[in-house]
């Protein structure tokens, strides 16, 4: 279930948030096995929902959590793409992604201008000034940078493109 909790002072969103939470379920496999069956929770300052298109737009201090997964940004567009799947496009001044690695005290941490999360493929795509780190006790162990990074949470693999998609080499 995806409860969308309004921040204090925004209780008028509660009925809409409750209706939205009944619609959005997301079972998916993740690097951290404990994340698989966790619900998605989203917090933001404002929520706009279109029932016809199944698109929710969260605006202001957006935080998506699912188990150990945490994605933050200024704005997120969440689209229902099937019965049990969603995509989330997060924008912001360096949107961020973090997930605990399975069976160890390490995290994968990424930042980019835009982050795209797809529950169907269990992939996170970072675009624009993208950086991905493997961290141990919040200290970087490895780091990669590029215009476009695709990270597969289920296989813990990634691919990097030095330029953003559509950008031509100089």
Specify the residue positions occupied by each region the protein language model found:
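Mature-chain termini and adjacent capping regions
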Residues: 1-170
């Amino acid at each position: 279930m995806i409860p969308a909790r309004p921040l204090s002072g925004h209780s008028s969103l509660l009925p809409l948030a409750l209706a939205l939470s009944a619609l959005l379920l997301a079972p998916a496999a993740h690097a951290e096995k404990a994340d698989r069956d966790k619900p998605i929770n989203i917090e933001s300052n404002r929520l706009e929902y279109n029932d016809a298109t199944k698109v929710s737009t969260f605006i202001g201090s957006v935080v998506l959590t699912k188990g150990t997964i945490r994605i933050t940004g200024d704005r997120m567009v969440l689209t229902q793409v099937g019965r049990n799947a969603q995509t989330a496009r997060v924008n912001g001044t360096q949107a961020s992604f973090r997930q605990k690695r399975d069976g160890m005290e390490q995290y994968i941490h990424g930042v980019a201008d835009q982050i795209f999360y797809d529950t169907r493929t269990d992939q996170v795509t970072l675009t624009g000034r993208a950086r991905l780190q493997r961290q141990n006790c919040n200290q970087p162990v490895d780091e990669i940078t590029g215009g476009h990074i695709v990270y597969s949470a289920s296989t813990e693999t990634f691919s990097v493109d030095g330029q953003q998609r559509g950008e031509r080499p100089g």
